[in-house]
Regions:
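N-terminal secretory signal peptides that target proteins for export/translocation
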Residues: 1-8
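N-terminal export leaders
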Residues: 9-18
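N-terminal signal peptide c-region/cleavage motif recognized by signal peptidases
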Residues: 25-27
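N-terminal secretory signal peptides
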Residues: 30-79, 83-85
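Exported/periplasmic cell-wall-interacting domains
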Residues: 34-35, 77, 90-175
């Protein structure tokens, strides 16, 4: 009998985890789901992600950032988390980091800034969970800025953000 591929196993695991999580938290989740986020705000200096509805935060999560978190992302490989206005323009249920939401980085300002210096602005910025195949102890991923520039949450928090956002939800990232 052939064995399942790694992406297929990850999808099944993500689905099973989602079912377990929903069965445990369904009443609270249903109440919160009535209030979907119409905007997401990340405040880097606070290490917080806020889900907003009509301009009011209704959920807040601890986040970890790129290895070089101070200042806006300027170029590919600088390990910084961008700052500015973006969209959550893609969803990946088969991510290497549990689940991921794609950030529409770079925007026009990011591209112009990088071009002035003849740099590549980089890309592939995500909001995501923890690595499916961690290389370090779990505590590292929960206490240290560790990404290449992405915004990381615990898997439980990532699942909530996934469920409470829609495609193309506006995202603001500020210092």
């Amino acid at each position: 009998m052939p064995t399942a591929t790694a992406p297929a196993r990850r999808r099944r695991l993500a689905g099973a985890l989602a079912c377990v999580w929903l069965s445990v938290t369904a009443p609270a989740c249903v109440a919160e789901a009535l209030r979907m986020a119409d905007e997401v705000l990340v405040v880097k200096s606070e290490r917080r992600l806020y889900l907003l509805h009509d301009g009011q935060a209704f959920k807040s999560y601890k986040v970890l950032l790129g290895l070089n978190p101070l200042g806006p992302k300027e170029r590919e490989g600088d390990f910084r988390t961008p700052e500015g206005h973006y969209l959550l323009d893609g969803r990946n249920a088969a991510s290497d980091f549990f689940l991921s939401l794609h950030v529409s980085y770079p925007n026009g300002q990011d591209v112009a800034r990088a071009q002035r210096r003849r740099w590549s602005p980089g890309g592939s910025i995500m909001i995501h969970g923890l690595p499916n195949l961690p290389r370090r102890a779990l505590k590292y991923y929960q206490t240290s800025d560790w990404t290449d520039g992405c915004i990381a949450l615990t898997n439980d928090d990532m699942l909530e953000v996934w469920l409470l956002t829609r495609p193309n939800t506006p995202l603001e990232i500020r210092q």
